Amino acid sequence: FQTTMTDFWTAIQELSKDPSSSVTQGMLVQRAAEFVQRAGAVYSGLSSYQNNLNTQIKQNVDKINKYGNQLLTLNDQIRAIESGGIEHANDLRDARNQILDELAELTNMTFSEDRYGSVSVQIEGVDFVKDGTCYEIALKTDEATGFYTPFWPQNATYTVRADGTRDYNIDGAEVFDLSVEISSDLNTDIGGLKAMLLARGDHRANYTDLAEGKYDSVSQSVVMNIQGEFDQMIHNVVTKVNDILAKAAGVQTGDLELADGTKLENARYCTVDPDGYMRMEDGSPIQLFTKVTTDGYEKVSVKEADGSLKDYWVMKKEDPDSPESLYTIGNLQVNPALTKEPSKLGFRLADGSEDKETADALKAAFTEEAYTLNPNVQKKTTFVDYYTDLVSQVSNSGYVFRSIYENQVTTVEATQSAREQVIGVSTDEELSNMIKFQNAYNASSRYINVISEMLDHILSTLGV
């Protein structure tokens, strides 16, 4: 993508040298199309990674439920063998301990054993295996994304659909509370399943998730954080380019009163002028980047000071609650009219002169240090350097996470080694015991042989 970004920047630089050239205009439109296409490919790759994590989440939940039912079976078998107080079901206990170890890798779990030899298990403080019952974890599927959310059915409410299936309301019944701070001090960083949920996130993020007050909802998700920052870069480039072209087309900001009395505050608007500079055939301002689902401008009738009505083009505002109104990666395309005829840009004013001012403004926009990766970053960057900073941030975060992972692996291995010293089997120790017992057997055997010979001699002598 860095190459695509550089090519787009180069096309803008070439345009500033000769704005009215059909060659430089065509190159600008072509590079803009590549920019949108490659941005979509990068975002699609991030979404695919989310889907992969989502699949792993389901597989791990299925595995946890399988372990729960296996524990019930082992509890019954161990209890049956040890109920007489004579035998010990060591092999079965080893198998059960192995399952508990596997559960501990996936979740924050605790367990206890009763006097009959049965274990009870809690996951995130909620009963999972208890009193001969396994309370299986269920999955709620998000209709928009297909993302799974693990929840406890026994703690959820539900309604029955017409087809007889249950529609669960899982508020308060989620297995994991992902809103809490992730910290070793708080013991909230335990379990592979929770880590996958955090990494995946709960939706496909875009630039609106980086707004003040919303960033905390995506900051803990590696994938969503990258999605939001990347989409923000694309949004900033697209809207900045369109804004510069809008200014050239005569778009201004002010308050308007529509024919029906509706008042628009701080609206961006212009008159309907099919013959105007940087205008389409319908008189609306030219946009290099347009939305797929909705138009960028809306024609309205405005009440003039003398009471007459006049048509204007008003730029539609973006609404975070209305995805189709946003200039986001999944809703972007290069203006189809410019794709067919790039020379519509013109860059030639009414007097026949080249519009160097607009071309230079496009060039200056790419070197303006006015953008940050997210609300927690203070460093201002340019369009040219934004993607480099984004990649560097991901790289640095990955290095930190890898260091943490390696430290945790070392800790786990040390703990496991200490554990094996207590409950494990040492081959050297077992071999030493075998030799000791063999020597003891041989010594005992020789002793018995001597006694046997002595008795035989006495009996034989007395018998004579």
Task: Pin down the residues of each PLM region.
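Structural signature of extracellular appendage/secretion-system components
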Residues: F1-V464
